[in-house]
């Protein structure tokens, strides 16, 4: 889908670049496949802010997307493509031959009327699902499982994809968008193709108010605060903070490594950080 720009009638319109969603379905989602969604405003169950700068925004209903795709060897027809406010990608409403409806992540080049299927050995075409071990090397995939049968977890954002670059016994070597190469079990399933809406990365929000519609509140800099509020606060006149960047709680930020999951280190063949050096 193409990008839309607008006549500069206001400063916000001048900067605004949006994805043209005119080809998507314009009605409401299927009620049986939606759930209510409460806005937390960044607060936990005790009412304390646990995530800063969240709150407000347009009310949203959650579309229950099928990330497992475990209905094997039952063909489904794409009924329509829809917008989903809960994710950057578009979703597709599919109807299985037995009459069941489901939402799936829409891959690129999937059109209304197309037939898709999940199975152990299926055609390599966008929207079809099969175990990674049965896919040819070089296949572009998305919505990849990390644990067998848990449902897709990798490559689900707009425009993302991974590529199968090799095999190692029971495992498949997958190269992710970040450049990381990791081992995934061959019985884990993936969906063929890249995720829809690749132009999302080229959009411009245009104005602060649009971010408020999305539920994001203004982000305050530490150097603009008082010493009681932030380690970078205070000082006479404008200062740069005077120390290495830290969070409001004094922990190093901007580049400090936080990964501690040693048990899965053995599955990472090439770190995304090593690729940049």
From Swiss-Prot:
GO CC terms, sorted: large ribosomal subunit
InterPro entries per record: NA-bd_OB-fold, Rib_uL2_dom2, Ribosomal_uL2, Ribosomal_uL2_bac/org-type, Ribosomal_uL2_C, Ribosomal_uL2_CS, Ribosomal_uL2_dom3, Ribosomal_uL2_RNA-bd_dom
Region (Disordered): 222-265
Reported function: One of the primary rRNA binding proteins. Required for association of the 30S and 50S subunits to form the 70S ribosome, for tRNA binding and peptide bond formation. It has been suggested to have peptidyltransferase activity; this is somewhat controversial. Makes several contacts with the 16S rRNA in the 70S ribosome.
Family of the protein in this entry: Belongs to the universal ribosomal protein uL2 family.
PANTHER family given in the database record: LARGE RIBOSOMAL SUBUNIT PROTEIN UL2M (PTHR13691:SF5), RIBOSOMAL PROTEIN L2 (PTHR13691)
Subunit structure: Part of the 50S ribosomal subunit. Forms a bridge to the 30S subunit in the 70S ribosome.
Keyword Disulfide bond: no
Annotated protein name in UniProt: Large ribosomal subunit protein uL2
Alphabetically ordered keywords of this record: Ribonucleoprotein, Ribosomal protein, RNA-binding, rRNA-binding
Short name of any one Pfam family annotated for the protein: Ribosomal_L2
Gene name as annotated: rplB
Record HAMAP family: Ribosomal_uL2_B
GO molecular function, one term: rRNA binding
GO biological process: cytoplasmic translation
């Amino acid at each position: 889908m193409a990008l839309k720009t607008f006549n500069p009638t206001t400063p916000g319109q001048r900067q605004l670049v949006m994805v043209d969603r005119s080809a998507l379905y314009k009605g409401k989602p299927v009620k049986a496949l939606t759930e209510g969604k409460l806005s937390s405003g960044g607060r936990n169950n005790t009412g304390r802010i646990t995530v800063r700068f969240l709150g407000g925004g347009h009310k949203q209903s959650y579309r229950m997307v099928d990330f497992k795709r475990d209905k094997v060897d039952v063909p489904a027809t794409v009924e329509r493509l829809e917008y989903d406010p809960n994710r950057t990608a578009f979703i597709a409403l599919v109807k299985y031959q037995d009459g069941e409806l489901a939402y799936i992540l829409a891959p690129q080049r999937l059109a209304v009327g197309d037939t898709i299927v999940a199975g152990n050995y299926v055609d390599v075409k966008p929207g079809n699902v099969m175990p990674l071990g049965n896919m040819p090397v070089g296949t572009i995939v998305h919505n990849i499982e990390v644990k067998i049968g848990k449902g897709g977890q990798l490559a689900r954002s707009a425009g993302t994809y991974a590529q199968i670059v090799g095999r190692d016994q029971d495992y498949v070597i997958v190269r992710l968008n970040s450049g990381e190469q990791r081992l995934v079990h061959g019985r884990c399933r993936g969906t063929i193709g890249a995720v829809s809406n690749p132009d999302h990365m080229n959009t411009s929000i245009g104005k602060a108010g649009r971010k408020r519609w999305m539920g994001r509140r203004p982000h305050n800099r530490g150097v603009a605060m008082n010493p009681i509020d932030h380690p970078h606060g205070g000082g006479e006149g404008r200062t740069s903070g005077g120390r290495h960047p830290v969070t409001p709680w004094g922990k190093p930020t901007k580049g400090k490594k936080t990964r501690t999951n040693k048990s899965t280190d053995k599955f990472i063949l090439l770190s995304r950080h090593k690729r940049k050096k």
